[in-house]
């Protein structure tokens, strides 16, 4: 292109993906990203924490969605004058990596890992977690997401891991880390416990599962002397028959009423409220032999269903449990303390220790010989058979199986390997979250959440019920728990280390690798053992991977060993974003560690977006192929199209989003193409590059500049509160006004090379591309560089508030003009009256018709009507229909809400000057009622948006109007013919037209109209044998003069 001309653009639809690749190549060669950071050296910093993804798989739509937000916000903040570092990170430890390696190597259990050697296995994990880094970098780059890959951090790095063990040592020193024996969610496939928050991260952790449910009678022995229960059966219900061999007690609620009933030759005890549920087994009206409060049953002894642990101290008695209800079951709960959290708490209180006959693989051990070696889920069937037949191990104590059914219920599954979990008592290390839970709730109030309801809803409620966090994992690839214990219980000692220096001090060697097995090789004599025979050895567990990622703010910079001042100035972070499930994951662990270590929140602002679903509304699945291939979308529609589709959706306000190819293409149609076509239109018709100007007096120029000023303010407001969908909607609406109103209404001015129009559109596009740059970084880069010839739109500042002239009255008036035209056009379309057919009259009824008075001619021209009449008599053509919003008003008004509804339905509602509604005995506020303007004659009348008024279209068609419409149809066809023959818009032509006899009068009447519109300096009628057929039997020939 020359210095005074816009680039020559290819005709037709743009190849947006190809243009995007050119931009990406330019950015790479120009090092534009680095320049954007360097340009802000010395500026205030905006701290963005980029949550680390796992790199042992390819990115999916969820990653892309979050990645776009992680790009938009830093771009915007950079344009607002901040320096925003964007350091990428990798989450490398934990089960995700281990399971991938197990799959690659054909490993099915931990014994095979031990056989191959921990060193070899962890080497394979290290290679696996970095396997897809190149692919990740390619995807992120194709997104047009700017991140610093060269200075990335990895949770497997020695410096990062040292900061993590420092954090653990800090918790230990504060008394917030301890070893305990608890019932935890346990994955028998991976042979490790999970923390409770991991069960609440994803909706699909709980999957529908069918399990056997049994109701079993346990025989009472030696009952209280006066309660008459000896020989009766306590009915218990359970969906885990495999736990019955470990039964040590049953629980009742002290406040529930229980009954002893006679059924056949047996007596059964259950909650009175559950009698009807067991009518089939106990009879419709069983004989009630006694009624008891639950408190009266406490201490009652019984025979367990299996006789494996008959001598267990304090076992086999009725205990009190506040968790017992009559919602289901029998009101009496079977307790196996090793496999139930509540069970263990209640049992421990009376001195009942748990029995643990299930090994780390979920199989019964030798203590229950009849089921030894069977997996607990597989053993269910045999256990039920033995109870039913009272054979085998169930024969001794004579339990009675009175019901066996299949029970379908949501059941927790491992979030990594997807196998059903069990609950199992294990020794684990914990963070004592319950000690500072209240402080976490307090600090949460300092965080700004989007959506706002997450603060006191999903996140806040989770914090209120937070339990101690199990942080140890019986695995291999992870940050080691830095705890060394004496191997001789006679000389107990625990040492906890928080740095490489401390390890070197005690072990005489500075670790070059903190991973297993090398860290396990560090041993030393126990200083507390005078015999010198015991050794300090590291416990074999590694830390929960969420402890790694929760340490990201300080571990990424090796705090506190380096960068102390930097960390203090960059903590807490200004902004983080992930999907809503991270309220139980990364958001949560960040908050736990920040509260415990620093007594501060880890982040100031958090966006928790919804979930991306496949086009069938289900979770995305590779096997179902229920989502468009990411690469194909990039290749066909481009990254900006995908970015717009995801960012403009409700998903960033907490809703879920179904991904469809049509939805992505709609973004191209609604915004990308209109922006490009406007730029292309300017480049085509402007004789030279426009000049920055905001002083045109033409009403359309003044309007679009003032409208742009509103866009600047609206986008600023939305982006400041992280409302990216709102920002997208503002941009979409402005693009609509720019292309379908300003440019279309100004075409003749551009064809005439009007300098005011050209300079105004140049100015508008220059500002618009800057405003849209964070949302659409690729297409705006192309347009902006074409307009300005400068380096990059992403090296510019956000437009200042005083950059553009404001005119709120003009914007309001012209927007109402557009609404009027839109409503009237819809009426015309409904009547099937073509656009070029003139109509006699349009009535516009609005509250302030004087506002529209200057635009009457514009409205008439736009709508092709001969007369536009303005009036304020809205009630002549429609009425306001009032309805009470009972959901909002009900809680305040109580019973008066029904009287208000009745009054409004009877037409007795009156809107007061202050906007309140008087309805019967009640006065309703503006949000407690709805007002809708309804047209009296819907066939000819339409309401304007927000009840601003009505338009009434007279669709009467006279012969004169039909003739003029016929002429305008021919004008359109002739303009298309000019275009197809390659004529420039300014070329004058000679026209010969052949018209059927029945249309000759119409043609001659409107000859001058036709000739003027198509720039015909010579126009004649004649018979043509070989002219071009256009419409309605007309043939023409044209030639340039």
From Swiss-Prot:
Keyword annotations of the record: Aminoacyl-tRNA synthetase, ATP-binding, Cytoplasm, Ligase, Metal-binding, Nucleotide-binding, Protein biosynthesis, Zinc
Short motif ('KMSKS' region): ranges: 619-623
InterPro entries referenced in this protein's UniProt entry, alphabetically: aa-tRNA-synth_I_CS, aa-tRNA-synth_Ia, Anticodon_Ile_ABEc, Ile-tRNA-ligase, Ile-tRNA-ligase_type2, M/V/L/I-tRNA-synth_anticd-bd, Rossmann-like_a/b/a_fold, tRNAsynth_Ia_anticodon-bd
A GO term for molecular function: tRNA binding
CDD domains: Anticodon_Ia_Ile_ABEc, IleRS_core
Reaction it catalyzes: tRNA(Ile) + L-isoleucine + ATP = L-isoleucyl-tRNA(Ile) + AMP + diphosphate
Annotated residues for binding of ATP: 622
Self-association state and partner proteins as the record states: Monomer.
Function: Catalyzes the attachment of isoleucine to tRNA(Ile). As IleRS can inadvertently accommodate and process structurally similar amino acids such as valine, to avoid such errors it has two additional distinct tRNA(Ile)-dependent editing activities. One activity is designated as 'pretransfer' editing and involves the hydrolysis of activated Val-AMP. The other activity is designated 'posttransfer' editing and involves deacylation of mischarged Val-tRNA(Ile).
Protein name (Swiss-Prot/TrEMBL): Isoleucine--tRNA ligase
Organism per entry: Mycobacterium bovis (strain ATCC BAA-935 / AF2122/97)
Record lineage: Bacteria, Bacillati, Actinomycetota, Actinomycetes, Mycobacteriales
């Amino acid at each position: 292109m020359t210095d005074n001309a816009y680039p020559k653009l290819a005709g037709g639809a743009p190849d947006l993906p190809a243009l995007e690749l050119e931009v990406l190549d330019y950015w790479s060669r120009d090092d534009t990203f680095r320049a954007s950071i360097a340009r802000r050296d010395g500026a205030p910093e905006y701290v963005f924490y980029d949550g680390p993804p796992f790199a042992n798989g390819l990115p999916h739509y969820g990653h892309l969605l979050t990645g776009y937000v992680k790009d938009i916000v830093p771009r915007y903040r950079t344009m607002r004058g901040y320096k925003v570092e964007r350091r990428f990170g990798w989450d490398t430890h934990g089960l995700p990596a281990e399971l991938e390696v197990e799959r690659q190597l054909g490993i099915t259990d931990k014994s095979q890992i031990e056989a191959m050697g921990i060193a070899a296995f962890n080497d394979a994990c290290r290679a696996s977690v970095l396997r897809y880094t190149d692919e990740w970098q390619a995807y992120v780059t194709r997104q047009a997401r700017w991140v610093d890959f060269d200075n990335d951090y990895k949770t497997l790095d020695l410096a990062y891991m040292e900061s993590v063990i420092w954090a653990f040592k800090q918790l230990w020193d504060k008394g917030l880390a301890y070893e305990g024996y608890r019932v935890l969610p346990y994955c028998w496939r991976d042979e490790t416990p999970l923390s409770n928050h991991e069960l609440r991260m994803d909706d699909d952790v709980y999957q529908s599962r069918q399990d056997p449910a049994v109701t079993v009678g346990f025989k009472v022995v030696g009952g209280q002397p006066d309660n008459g229960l000896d020989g009766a059966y306590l009915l218990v219900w359970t969906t885990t028959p495999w736990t019955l061999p470990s039964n040590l007690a049953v629980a009742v609620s002290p406040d529930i009423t229980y009954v002893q009933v006679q059924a056949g030759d047996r007596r059964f005890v259950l909650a009175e409220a559950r009698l009807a549920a067991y009518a089939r087994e106990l009879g419709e009206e069983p004989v009630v032999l006694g009624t008891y409060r639950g408190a009266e049953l406490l201490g009652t002894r019984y025979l367990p269903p299996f006789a494996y642990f008959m001598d267990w101290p304090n076992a086999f008695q009725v205990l009190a449990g506040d968790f017992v209800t009559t919602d289901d079951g029998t009101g009496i709960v079977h307790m196996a303390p090793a496999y139930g959290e509540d069970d263990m708490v209640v049992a421990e209180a009376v001195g009942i220790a748990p029995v643990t006959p299930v090994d780390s693989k979920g199989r019964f051990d030798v203590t229950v010989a009849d089921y030894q070696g069977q997996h607990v889920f597989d053993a269910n069937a045999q256990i039920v058979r033995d109870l039913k037949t009272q054979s085998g191990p169930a024969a001794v104590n004579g339990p009675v199986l009175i019901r066996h059914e299949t029970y379908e219920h949501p059941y927790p599954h491992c979030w990594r390997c997807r196998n059903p979990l069990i609950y199992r008592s294990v020794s684990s290390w914990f963070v004592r979250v319950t000690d500072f839970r209240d402080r976490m709730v307090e600090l949460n109030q300092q965080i700004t959440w989007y959506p706002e309801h997450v603060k006191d809803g999903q996140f806040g409620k989770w914090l209120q019920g937070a339990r101690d966090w199990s942080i140890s994992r019986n695995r291999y690839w992870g940050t080691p728990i830095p705890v060394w214990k004496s191997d001789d219980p006679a000389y107990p000692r625990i040492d906890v280390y928080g740095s490489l220096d401390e390890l070197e001090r005690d072990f005489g060697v500075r670790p070059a690798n903190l991973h297993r097995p090398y860290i396990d090789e560090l041993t030393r004599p126990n200083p507390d053992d005078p015999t010198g025979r015991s050794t300090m050895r590291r416990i074999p567990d590694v830390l929960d991977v969420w402890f790694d990622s929760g340490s990201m703010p300080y571990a990424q910079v090796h705090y506190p060993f380096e960068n102390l001042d930097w960390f203090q100035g960059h903590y807490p972070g200004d902004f983080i974003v992930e999907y809503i499930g991270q309220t139980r994951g990364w958001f949560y662990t960040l908050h736990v560690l920040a509260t415990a270590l620093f007594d501060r929140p880890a982040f100031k602002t958090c966006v928790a977006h919804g979930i991306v679903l496949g086009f069938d509304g289900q979770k995305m699945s590779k096997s179902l192929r229920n989502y468009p291939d990411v690469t194909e979308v990039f290749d066909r529609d481009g990254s900006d199209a995908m970015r717009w589709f995801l960012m403009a959706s409700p998903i960033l306000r907490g809703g879920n989003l179904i991904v469809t190819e049509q939805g992505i293409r709609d973004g191209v149609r609604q915004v990308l193409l209109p922006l490009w076509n406007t730029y292309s239109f300017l480049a085509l018709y402007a004789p030279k590059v426009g000049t920055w100007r905001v002083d045109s007096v033409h009403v359309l120029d003044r309007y679009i500049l003032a409208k742009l000023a509103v866009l600047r303010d609206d986008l600023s407001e939305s982006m400041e509160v992280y409302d990216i969908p709102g920002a997208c909607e503002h941009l979409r609406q402005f693009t609509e006004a720019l292309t379908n109103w300003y440019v279309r209404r100004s075409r003749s001015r551009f064809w005439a090379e009007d300098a005011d129009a050209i300079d105004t559109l140049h100015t508008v596009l220059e500002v618009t591309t800057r405003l849209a740059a964070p949302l659409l970084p690729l297409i705006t880069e192309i347009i902006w560089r074409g307009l300005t010839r400068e380096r990059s739109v992403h090296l510019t500042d956000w437009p200042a508030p005083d950059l553009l002239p404001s005119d709120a009255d003009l914007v309001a008036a012209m927007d109402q003009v557009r609404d009027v035209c839109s409503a009237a056009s819809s009426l015309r379309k409904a009547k099937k009256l073509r656009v070029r057919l003139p109509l006699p009259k349009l009535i516009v009824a609005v509250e302030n018709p004087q506002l529209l008075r200057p635009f009457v001619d514009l409205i008439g021209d736009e709508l092709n009507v001969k007369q536009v009449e303005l009036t304020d008599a809205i009630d002549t053509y429609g009425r306001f229909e009032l309805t009470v919003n009972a959901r909002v008003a009900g809680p305040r008004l109580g019973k008066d809400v029904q009287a208000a509804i009745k009054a409004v339905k009877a037409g007795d509602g009156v809107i007061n000057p202050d906007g309140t509604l008087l309805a019967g005995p009640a006065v309703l506020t503006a949000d407690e009622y709805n007002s809708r303007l309804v047209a009296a004659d819907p066939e000819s009348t339409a309401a304007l948006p927000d009840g601003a008024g009505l338009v009434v279209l007279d669709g009467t068609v006279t012969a004169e109007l039909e003739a003029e419409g016929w002429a305008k149809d021919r004008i359109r066809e002739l303009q298309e013919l000019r275009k197809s023959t390659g004529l420039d818009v300014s070329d004058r032509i000679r026209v010969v037209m052949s018209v059927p006899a029945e249309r000759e009068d119409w043609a001659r009447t409107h000859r001058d109209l036709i000739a003027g519109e198509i720039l015909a300096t010579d126009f004649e009628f004649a018979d043509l044998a070989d002219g071009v057929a256009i419409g309605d039997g007309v043939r023409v020939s044209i030639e340039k003069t």
